[in-house]
Amino acid sequence: MDASLEKIADPTLAEMGKNLKEAVKMLEDSQRRTEEENGKKLISGDIPGPLQGSGQDMVSILQLVQNLMHGDEDEEPQSPRIQNIGEQGHMALLGHSLGAYISTLDKEKLRKLTTRILSDTTLWLCRIFRYENGCAYFHEEEREGLAKICRLAIHSRYEDFVVDGFNVLYNKKPVIYLSAAARPGLGQYLCNQLGLPFPCLCRVPCNTVFGSQHQMDVAFLEKLIKDDIERGRLPLLLVANAGTAAVGHTDKIGRLKELCEQYGIWLHVEGVNLATLALGYVSSSVLAAAKCDSMTMTPGPWLGLPAVPAVTLYKHDDPALTLVAGLTSNKPTDKLRALPLWLSLQYLGLDGFVERIKHACQLSQRLQESLKKVNYIKILVEDELSSPVVVFRFFQELPGSDPVFKAVPVPNMTPSGVGRERHSCDALNRWLGEQLKQLVPASGLTVMDLEAEGTCLRFSPLMTAAVLGTRGEDVDQLVACIESKLPVLCCTLQLREEFKQEVEATAGLLYVDDPNWSGIGVVRYEHANDDKSSLKSDPEGENIHAGLLKKLNELESDLTFKIGPEYKSMKSCLYVGMASDNVDAAELVETIAATAREIEENSRLLENMTEVVRKGIQEAQVELQKASEERLLEEGVLRQIPVVGSVLNWFSPVQALQKGRTFNLTAGSLESTEPIYVYKAQGAGVTLPPTPSGSRTKQRLPGQKPFKRSLRGSDALSETSSVSHIEDLEKVERLSSGPEQITLEASSTEGHPGAPSPQHTDQTEAFQKGVPHPEDDHSQVEGPESLR
């Protein structure tokens, strides 16, 4: 491209193309460096400040732009903020720079150039999309073209609108018909732009019995038109869909065109399926859109072109009305909106344009054919063979549910059962969509909620493939990832009802119905002081659930646990995640209940012990104070004087009554240390009993993870394996009971020889009576001599 720039005679154009290429390359290189860096910190250039007195060069300015673009990224890896644009993208970006440069030409040159650009682009688009004798309006906002078309229809049907204004509309109100499957907010946008009240909008329902549930009901539309005419209203405009915003279904445009011609209604068509008009084979429903009065298209996403305007093609013979409606303009700068698309179309050519749309349609067909072979995947566009949009969802019939159930409640199913099954599948589909978007980001998959079907996954390569560079291998990887996630989805869905029944049958546990959770279920432990009538959070419950989460994570099972909800004002719950294998729900619930109960008991014991210790410390302080006062009375005041006290203690030592004090945590009292010295002298060690371990978990084989169902009843086990399994269990039981037997044997061996020795008995009796032992007297007398 650098060599071709040298051939340009105008040095300004050559310099512009060179600068644009260098700027884009600099931003892309800096983006790659930013992605390679870990933990990028905010630099001083990102902080707003005053305008510098001296100017900066272009490299410094672009560096500042790059810092502003990537300085606030999170630490977690995210999708690139700048799409990987190729040469055709550079041409589209160059169009905006050229537009600013061309606007500086003199008026005559500017008029000729803009007229040529607008006429060329209009002619090319009309021929590509089979729209004969049409005009084009280029606009940045996708809905702006429809608003201009509505103004044109109003001026065409109300001849006195220019003079009388809205008084004409008041006498005969216009009606704009929108499909129930239209994109959200379209009707409100039109009313705001046109200044019409909301009663001027008429929402046409979709089919309910025959045909797609996302297609406009033509018979009902005709009935609405007749009713409006009888009420003195004027049917003005009908917005049809060639590919609805949700699932990509196409209305029966041929029937709608006949109906509009019969009642004099303007027919406007929009939708992603209009791109297939450029292909050699087009379905009859989409081909009928070429005969409509106007249609809006978005070639930018279809071709992967950044900053390319949307296009509205229309047919009208009165230039004055189109000028009043705003579809045409006398300003040359307004005509320059087509410049980026004009450059890009010339760069791609007709073959490149058609090839991109064809590639996107082939990706959709490839995914649709592959998903038909996958179990538990329901495709919502099977009747739309030519649709470039594929919408699917995971769906598995639960035991006891009606196999006819799809989205409409079946009479023999209770509403609660239908809703529970629907919410369960919706949560699982949301989880599946998030997983697929992370595993296959090039697929451009989106998650959406439909009113009838529920949560679904949409694959629309026409809107994403050119930008993300989606290939056939990405579609195959997407199908493989779906198949790998199906066992987890099926296992989780089957365990939900069993988990709920086990929780409801367990005392102290409450099942929480959270439709947005995709895991096995949500459970809450109700402690003794829990206020069941209130949903506000309590600190005790939060501590119990936090300890429960820690204990469960220490088990190293395949399940994931978390504490919720995210709203801090609500009571905390335990969320059990997805199940990748056959989980024993009974053991899981029993473990949760037993662990939570143990944590609560330990917390109660700790609270009681704290209170006992606090009271014991207070009593001990009082006793120590009394002992200090008694010692003062017994020894006298003179012994407390340093010099005098030493002399008195030298000649008349004080006989100590106690060797020390110890604080008993269990009783919360201050005791003497004499028993400890007695036991030390005898050498009698105390054997503590083994700590009892909880028996809430069943015995498992070595290497078997918690919460797994046992395979004792499996026919695949041979006699040898079963015998070895029994021997392993016996060894485990023998090892677990070993310390207790050893302790019992040791205690019996020490206790059988007979009663305690006489010396030990005498010492104990002497201690209990408070009479000092002769040996103690001897040691007390020799104390001062040794000091001397």
From Swiss-Prot:
Similarity comment text for this entry: Belongs to the group II decarboxylase family.
An example Gene Ontology molecular-function term: carboxy-lyase activity
EC numbers: 4.1.1.-
Organism expressing this protein natively: Homo sapiens (Human)
Bias (Basic and acidic residues) ranges: 28-40, 725-734, 772-788
One GO BP: carboxylic acid metabolic process
Gene: PDXDC1
Modification type Phosphoserine: residues: S652, S710, S718, S722, S748, S757, S779, S786
Keyword vocabulary terms for this entry: Decarboxylase, Lyase, Phosphoprotein, Pyridoxal phosphate
Listed name of the protein: Pyridoxal-dependent decarboxylase domain-containing protein 1
Modification sites for Phosphothreonine: T414, T687, T691
Spans annotated as Disordered: 28-51, 684-788
UniProt-listed InterPro entries: GrpII_AminoAcid_Decarb, PDXDC1-like_2nd, PDXDC1-like_3rd, PyrdxlP-dep_de-COase, PyrdxlP-dep_Trfase, PyrdxlP-dep_Trfase_major
Transmembrane segments: none
Needed co-factor(s): pyridoxal 5'-phosphate
Any one GO cellular component localisation term in the record: Golgi apparatus
Biased composition regions of type Polar residues, renumbered to the chain: 738-750
